[in-house]
């Protein structure tokens, strides 16, 4: 029994057949991250990153196409969607049209940065710019948590009132 366990452990560590594993098979085209790419020459820079483990990912936004990472700009009038396409090993293409609230994200960051003379970011104010951005994100998260808490407590209170009614 002991040698069989050792053999199973070694086989699970070596994972035979894992060299043929294709990470593009499990890649979710909707699982991308969007962050700002601050640059002095851009109104609002956005950095879209998708799937470093899969080389056949193409991101398209505003008539620009790039593999895995796309640095683009957003301004009013530019579409708020981007397309992610993944080419499978059999040649088939999976396409996902993702929408994102570029306008709200850019408006909030630009307002906060201009309010405190943080735009355009430079070596002198990048720390302050980052702190202001994080504080905005924390404020929005706290507001969301308070709203969810109020919703839950109101539903519990309403459920208790319904039980007491004859």
UniProtKB/Swiss-Prot annotation:
It holds the Pfam family Adeno_GP19K. The chain crosses the membrane at residues 132-152. Glycans are attached at residues 31, 63, 67, 97. Disulfide bonds join 32-50, 44-106. A motif (Di-lysine motif) lies at residues 162-166. GO terms for molecular function: D-mannose binding. It is a single-pass type I membrane protein. It is found in: Host endoplasmic reticulum membrane. It comes from the Viruses. Residues 1-19 form the signal peptide. The keyword Endoplasmic reticulum does not apply. Residues 153-166 are cytoplasmic. Both disulfide bonds are absolutely critical for the interaction with MHC antigens. N-glycosylated; high-mannose. Residues 20-131 are lumenal. Belongs to the adenoviridae E19 family. This is Early E3 18.5 kDa glycoprotein. The lineage of its organism: Viruses, Varidnaviria, Bamfordvirae, Preplasmiviricota, Tectiliviricetes.
